[in-house]
Structures are given as C-alpha cells and as structure tokens.
Amino acid sequence: MAQSSSPISGVAERYAGSLFELALQANSVAKVESDLNSFEAMLAGSSDLTRLINSPVFSGEEQAKAIAAIADKAGITGLTGNFLRVVARNRRLFAVPGMIKAFRQIAAEHRGETAAEVTSAHELTAAQQTELKAALKSVAGKDVAISVTVDPSLLGGLVVKIGSRQIDTSLKTKLNSLKLALKEVG
C-alpha cells in the first residue's frame, strides 16, 4: 500500500474525497462503501483483474470497457460504477486500492469512527471482530471500523494499524525479534 507521502496516495485521496462528496449528496455512502468492498474482494480474488488495473499495456478506453463489464456483472452500478469507469478512462486504476482505503477512512470519520486496518494470520470470526472492536475502542476513545485482511505469513497474532500507530502482536515479528537477539548474543 502506498505511503501517505507518495503521489499515489495523493491521487487516491482526491478521488476518494470526490466520490465521498457525491455519495453524501446522493445519500448513498453505505451503498458506495458496499460496492467498493465488493470490488476490493474481486481484486483480491482475481489475478487477471489485478493485472488489468496495474498494466500500462491497456489503453484507458480498453480498461474502461473491461471495468464496465466487470462492474455490471457484479451488480456495481450507479455512482460506484460510474466512478470506476471515470477512473479507468483517466488511467488511474492502479490507485483504486488506495482510493478504497481512503474512502473507508473518510466514511468512518464522517460517522464519528476511526478506521483500523487489521491483518491476521487466520480469518477472524464475527465474535473475535466484535471483541477486537471493543478493545480498540478503549484504546482509540471512539468507535472503530475495522478492515480485516488475512496474511498467513504472520503465523499467528495480529497487526493493527490505527492512524499513525501500529500494534504488532504477530508471531512472525516475535520470532524475528528473537532471531535478532540470538544473533547479538552469539
């Protein structure tokens, strides 16, 4: 994911801000957020779609046609579908993951929540997510909207990012720390 000082992040934030303003005017923030979550899930599940959004080989028109077909088939219509088409025509599809993340953060702030990115070694159950939200609420001081991704390389535990803070309780990090400590001793 892009760092906040990168040009991708700036592009993503501007597009996400514009989409949020339009969604707010149309009273469809929840629908747009749901559509973006669906598109993100499709991205995570399809290497071909990932290749399409990242490849400079395809023209903006080709990307727009492909995205239109994919969005229509997935039921992503209206504001979100139009947004994805415009992003494709403007050759900014490479920034869509950042746009989705930025939109989530803006929407969470609008609801009085703070957004947290949670990376887990295994899929979290609904009960675990509820418990995690409660724990993060006590740390953040307000409701927390979490976005969970699974990374089996963590082996166990969680990595939680809230704003500029990161809480890393992953087994991978603990093992790496132990490895470094053993190198210093030996």
Swiss-Prot record:
The lineage of its organism: Bacteria, Pseudomonadati, Pseudomonadota, Alphaproteobacteria, Hyphomicrobiales. It comes from the Bacteria. It comes from Mesorhizobium japonicum (strain LMG 29417 / CECT 9101 / MAFF 303099) (Mesorhizobium loti (strain MAFF 303099)). This is ATP synthase subunit delta. InterPro entries: ATP_synth_OSCP/delta_N_sf (IPR026015), ATPase_OSCP/d_CS (IPR020781), ATPase_OSCP/dsu (IPR000711). It is found in: Cell inner membrane. Keywords: ATP synthesis, Cell inner membrane, Cell membrane, CF(1), Hydrogen ion transport, Ion transport, Membrane, Transport. GO terms for molecular function: proton-transporting ATP synthase activity, rotational mechanism. It is a peripheral membrane protein.
